[in-house]
């Protein structure tokens, strides 16, 4: 049974501006596993796409959960890593989580479906 569906869309330029102004942004948004992947990218545009995609995923997850970020879950409580096929995955106790992330040059979006 579906518990919730969440969608988020963000401008990559917004994340890029935050990244330039806030030195701790990566630590606030990404888990250690996600930071490892982020640091593997040499291209700044690809780093911003990844960061924006994970930001959107965590927002979408919190919307699907029904609580929003900050109430019951924070950015670093949500670990979105890729499986061996490259598919983004979130493991969260009590739920089967379906994740889709996409981006263009200017936008990143994510959809999350939670099943119980």
Swiss-Prot record:
EC id: 2.7.8.7
Residues involved in Mg(2+) binding: 8, 59
InterPro entries associated with the record: 4-PPantetheinyl_Trfase_dom, 4-PPantetheinyl_Trfase_dom_sf, ACPS, Ppantetheine-prot_Trfase_dom
Any one Gene Ontology molecular-function term assigned to this protein's record: holo-[acyl-carrier-protein] synthase activity
Record GO cellular component, one term: cytoplasm
Domain of life per record: Bacteria
Enzyme class: transferase
Biological role stated in the UniProt entry: Transfers the 4'-phosphopantetheine moiety from coenzyme A to a Ser of acyl-carrier-protein.
Family note: Belongs to the P-Pant transferase superfamily. AcpS family.
Protein name per the record: Holo-[acyl-carrier-protein] synthase
Source organism: Staphylococcus saprophyticus subsp. saprophyticus (strain ATCC 15305 / DSM 20229 / NCIMB 8711 / NCTC 7292 / S-41)
């Amino acid at each position: 049974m579906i518990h919730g569906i969440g969608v988020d869309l963000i401008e990559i330029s917004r994340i890029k501006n935050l990244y330039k102004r806030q030195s701790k942004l990566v630590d606030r948004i990404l888990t250690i596993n996600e930071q490892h992947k982020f640091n593997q990218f040499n291209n700044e545009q690809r780093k911003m796409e990844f960061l924006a995609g994970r930001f959107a995923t965590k927002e979408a997850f919190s919307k699907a959960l029904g609580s929003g970020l900050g109430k019951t879950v924070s950015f670093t409580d949500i670990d979105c890593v890729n499986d061996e096929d490259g598919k983004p995955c979130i493991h969260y106790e009590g739920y089967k989580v379906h994740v889709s992330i996409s981006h263009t040059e200017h936008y990143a979006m994510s959809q999350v479906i939670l099943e119980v």
